[in-house]
């Protein structure tokens, strides 16, 4: 059987070693950069869906739209890094949960058809999110 040996360039191996030692510092910054296009698209989709197709004029206060945010990047028990984009369970000035309002818009309820905003955001921003994370990772690697 034929064998081949490939020797990696020393500078490349040094950068990989540095990346390994700084991995836990780099990943949260990369995930946050990847979340930027998602949050922008989610805000525009949500703004377009609020009050859409209703019989009465919208009485939106803007609190739901303002509550859209990202969580901090955290590492789970398996070692995977996660960052969530969405509406937290905070309540608006009238005491109604923003997450409940977002879920009703997304999935509908009895007598109110669904007006999805989060699922189209996920589909539309998958490539942009990956590209943003790749660019951020390349910048972080260049810094090493």
State each model region's role.
Residues 1-84, 89-94, 98-144:
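Short, Lys/Arg-rich flexible segments
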């Amino acid at each position: 059987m034929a064998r081949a040996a490939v020797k990696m360039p020393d500078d490349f191996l040094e950068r990989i070693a540095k990346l390994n030692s700084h991995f836990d510092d780099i990943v949260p910054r990369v995930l946050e950069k990847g979340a930027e296009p998602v949050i922008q698209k989610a805000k525009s989709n949500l703004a377009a869906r609020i009050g859409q197709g209703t019989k009465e004029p919208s009485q939106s206060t803007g609190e739901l739209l303002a509550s859209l945010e990202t969580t901090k990047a955290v590492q789970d028990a398996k070692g995977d890094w996660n960052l969530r984009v969405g509406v937290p369970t905070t309540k608006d000035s009238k005491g109604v949960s923003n997450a409940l309002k977002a879920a009703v818009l997304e999935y509908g309820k009895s007598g109110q058809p669904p007006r999805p905003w989060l699922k189209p955001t996920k589909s539309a921003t998958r490539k942009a999110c990956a590209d943003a994370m790749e660019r951020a990772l390349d910048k972080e690697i260049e810094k090493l």
